[in-house]
Amino acid sequence: MSKYTFTQKNFKVFEVPGLEGRMSAIESEIQPKLAALGTYFTDFLNTHTPDEFYAHIAKHARRTVNPPKDTWVAFSTNKRGYKMLPHFQIGLYEDQVFVMFGVMHEAKNKNHYIEVFEKHFDEIENLPDDYRICTDHVKMEKPLIKDLSTDELKEALHRAHQLKKGEFFIARTLSPKAPELKTDKAFKSYLEDTFDHLLKFYS
């Protein structure tokens, strides 16, 4: 039985109708794995950075009617929350596992963090071909960096700067049948490799 890896059964949780039913399924089927990933990668980040990280599992506490379409664990250097800081996330939708690092629009000093990405612009463009950007964390769509022109990528960063609701993340995704999800060892290796790349933009 997998401790970390998301299985076909986990993805089917997002087919459960109704808020109460889906939340119950998320809590029983997915959150134990998010907790395990939270422990493992908190230690990983604490080892690979000079800072102390904390894991935050999504609670979806504000929802009253609509069931969540995704869920995640986030990592930040604040024990109380993550939205106000640049942070890492591991999570899933019904047909996608995602891993990403960046800033939400709620982030304090958001422009400073966007400038860090801008300083590493060449490195962003030269990431492996399966890396993506995410400019809205509530949307599943994450275009591949290799499919964007230099001007389009610069415009995404510019919009994150200028718009109050602007956001910017570097991301990587897996489909439910990806070979990296066959075993815990393969999944952890994939995540560690991804975090190694994402840490280039952590400052």
Curated annotation (Swiss-Prot):
The record's section on InterPro entries has: UPF0637, UPF0637_domain_sf
Q: Which Pfam families match?
A: DUF1054
Which family would the database say this protein is a member of?
A: Belongs to the UPF0637 family.
Which protein are we looking at?
Answer: UPF0637 protein Sca_0732
Originating organism:
Staphylococcus carnosus (strain TM300)
